Amino acid sequence: MMKKILVVFLCLCMTVITFAACGERGGGGGDEGSAAGGEASYELVSGHVYTEDSLEHQQMLFLKDAIEEKTDGAVKVTIYANEQLGDEQTIAESVVAGSCDVGFSEGSVWATVVNKPEVAVFGLPFQLSGPDAAQEVTKELIKPEMNKLLEGTDIYCLGNVYSGFRHMLSVNKPIKTLEDLKGLKFRVPNATIYVQMFEDMGANPTTTAFSETYQALQQGVVEACECDLANIVQQNWHEVNHYMSKTYHLCANNVICINRAKWDSFPEDIQNAILEAVEESEDYCFEIRATADDEYIGAIEDAGVEIYEVPAEELARMKEACQPIYDEFEGYGLTDLLKKIDDISAKYQ
C-alpha cells in the first residue's frame, strides 16, 4: 500500500513540475501549443511494466519520436519503463487519476480501474485466429469501439499495442488437454478476465506481479504461467519452466489510453498529430512482431523447453469451457460487436 501511495505521489510531483515548466514557456493553451510552435509546450508522461528491450517499449519509443516530430517538438514525451511507476494496475489507476498521462494495458485492466467489465471485450479467450485478424481488429474496431465503451469515464482510447498471442508454460508437466489444467497453480495478471478464464478451465489462478513471476515459478509458489513469446524470453520465464503449450488462448491487445482531461486540453491539431503517430506505431508494432516470433521460439527451444502444439479439437474444448465469459459479454449488449470480431477472425482462418 505504501509503495502504491509513493508511486502516485511521485507521479503527481512530475505532473506539477511539468505544468509549472509549461507555464513558464507560455504553453497554457490555445494556439501556442500547436504543432507549428516548434517549442515543447506540452509534456506527456507515459508508464508501462515492460523492460526496455521489449517490443512494447520499442513501439513506445517509435511513438515518442513520431509525436515529437509531427508536433514540431510542441509535445515532449517521457517514458518510464519496467514498473518505474508501479505495476500494471497502479499505472492504469494513475492514468485515470491524471497523475500519469498515458498507459497501455489489456482491456481487462482498464475494465477493473473504470469499473466497466465490458471494456475487456477485445481480450476474450480464443477470440482471434491470428496476427492478420488482430491487425484488422486494431485498424477497424479497437479505438472507435473502446471509446464508445469508455464514454463517461476519465480515460480516452488512442489505439493499441499488439503484444502477440499468449501461450501456456508449466514447470512439472506439459499441458496437453483441458484436464491437465485441473487444480494447477497458475500465475495470471491481476485482471478479472484472466482469473475467470482459468477458473472456467479448472485451474487455480494466482495473481502475481509481472516482475515477481520468475521468482514465484522458481520457488514453487506457482506451477505454471502464460504470456506472449517475446515476454517469455525477455523475462527469462523459459529458464524456470520445462514445458510450453502453444494454445493461442488470448490475443494480447494492450489498449493505449490517455487521461481524458489531458486529452481535452490539447488543441485539435495536436490531437490529430498524436492519433496519426499512434496509427503509425501500430503498423510498426505488427511489422517487428512478425519477424521476432520465430527467434523467440528458437530461444525457448534452445533453453531445453519441450514445446507442444495443442490440437485444434482440444483448443475448442478449452474455448467451450470459457463459454460463460462470452455469455456475460453478450449480456452487456455486445452481441453485434462480438459478431464483428468473429467475422474478421473467420476471414483469416
PLM feature spans:
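Repetitive helical segments and hydrophobic/amphipathic motifs
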Residues: 12-13
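Positively charged n-region of N-terminal signal peptides that target proteins for export
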Residues: 1-8
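A gly/proline- and charged-residue-enriched helix-loop-helix capping module
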Residues: 129-147
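C-terminal motif of bacterial Sec signal peptides marking the signal peptidase cleavage site
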Residues: 18-21
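N-terminal secretory/targeting leader peptides
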Residues: 23-132, 151-349
